[in-house]
Swiss-Prot record:
Pathway: Cofactor biosynthesis; NAD(+) biosynthesis; deamido-NAD(+) from nicotinate D-ribonucleotide: step 1/1. Its EC number is 2.7.7.18. This is Probable nicotinate-nucleotide adenylyltransferase. Keywords: ATP-binding, NAD, Nucleotide-binding, Nucleotidyltransferase, Pyridine nucleotide biosynthesis, Transferase. It catalyses: nicotinate beta-D-ribonucleotide + ATP + H(+) = deamido-NAD(+) + diphosphate. GO terms for biological process: NAD biosynthetic process. Belongs to the NadD family.
Amino acid sequence: MPNKSPTRTLYALFGGTFDPIHYGHLKPVETLAQQVGLQHIILLPNHVPPHRPQPEANAQQRLKMVELAVAGNPLFSVDSRELLRDTPSFTIDTLESLRKERGAERPLAFIIGQDSLLSLHKWHRWQSLLDVCHLLVCARPGYAQTLETPELQQWLDAHRVFDPQALSLRPHGAIYLADTPLLDISATDIRHRRHNGESCDDLLPRAVQRYIELQGLYRG
């Protein structure tokens, strides 16, 4: 029998506006790391998200909150390249840049939520994503489990893997739907709470909460 491809270290990228970063971002991906054997997660704060309203916090404030949220946690690092752009942040551009840096053979994954999977066909060059990386999908409360059309569902089914070890055997091309905790926390809810003078202490790391207070962010 031919030998299996050697297992390589799996790295993952997790992008977002992070306005602000909160436990709904962090806890599911920490669980995901345990499930699939992730050695490292690179957080990628977006500068100008193409599909969303402009963030309330500026780029440097959002970067600082992300850095504070994961300080001292060896699972995470922060990549600020998207914040240096003056143009919209397209995921495929960043992934192709990172792929060139890390070589063609290293397994690379991009983490998204179930909500993003459902709208993935609206992303810029979405069909090129699996040519560059794997997709790791975290469950999100209240979102459908099937895609919009039979064609999209067939695309998902054709690339889906059920054994997370398969992600480390090839550099890209697979989709894994993870069983992560469903935390009904959103940045929108946190901003609304702040606008209304309500506490957010249980929704985000203490260091991030202190920074928000010091900067006077998300006040009504």
